[in-house]
A protein has these predicted regions:
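Residue-level marker of positions within ordered structural domains that often coincide
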Residues: 13, 96, 152
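A periodicity- and composition-biased signal for non-globular, repetitive helical segments
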Residues: 30-31, 46, 149
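Residue-level detector of intrinsically disordered, flexible termini
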Residues: 5-6, 16, 51-52, 134, ...
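Unchanged
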Residues: 41-141, 145
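N-terminal strand-loop-strand
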Residues: 1-38, 91
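Generic low-complexity, intrinsically disordered sequence content enriched
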Residues: 26, 69, 106, 151-154
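C-terminal/domain-terminus segments
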Residues: 143-155
Length: 155
């Protein structure tokens, strides 16, 4: 069965550009990789994807920004498939967030791989704002489409 995730691409307009907020995955596997993602997470049958995206944004950033906004504030960006096969459904939301205030939930992963040892890591270890060209070079493969769809939606 295909794993499904939902997430939110937070964006803001500056005097010269559109910027997007991305998170860097936590843990030793990602520590030295310059790979970034929209805040997202898996959802289950019966859970509306937008509800999951809002919940995951809060879990991965500590911000209630997405929970406090009305459904009509979100721009549907559709679904993409990441190279490993996970389907991600995304929404864009205009807003601001101070990356220094990021507080992420934690999870357990096996590390080192196949060691049987579990370590606790943050789901996200940091967040940052990027202009669109920089975001294109940093975001997980497959998620670039969300950036392009945001630009198209904003006209």
């Amino acid at each position: 069965m295909t794993k499904r995730s939902a997430g939110i691409l937070l964006y803001r307009r500056t005097s010269s550009a559109i910027e997007v907020f991305l998170i860097h995955p936590g843990g030793p596997f990602w520590a030295k990789k310059d790979a970034w993602s929209i805040p997202k997470g898996e959802y289950h049958d019966g859970e509306p994807p937008l509800d999951a995206a809002r919940r995951e944004f809060q879990e991965e950033t500590g911000s209630t920004l997405a929970l406090d906004r009305h459904e009509t504030d979100f721009i549907a960006l559709g679904a993409i498939r990441q190279p490993a096969g996970k389907e991600v459904t995304g929404w864009a939301l205009e807003g601001d967030f101070d990356p220094a205030s990021l507080v992420s939930n934690t999870c357990f992963v096996e590390w080192p791989p196949r060691s049987g040892r579990q370590i606790e890591i943050p789901e996200a270890d940091r967040g940052a704002w990027f202009d669109l060209p920089t975001a294109h070079s940093k975001i997980f493969r497959g998620q670039e489409a969300f950036l392009d769809r945001l630009v198209a939606a904003l006209g």
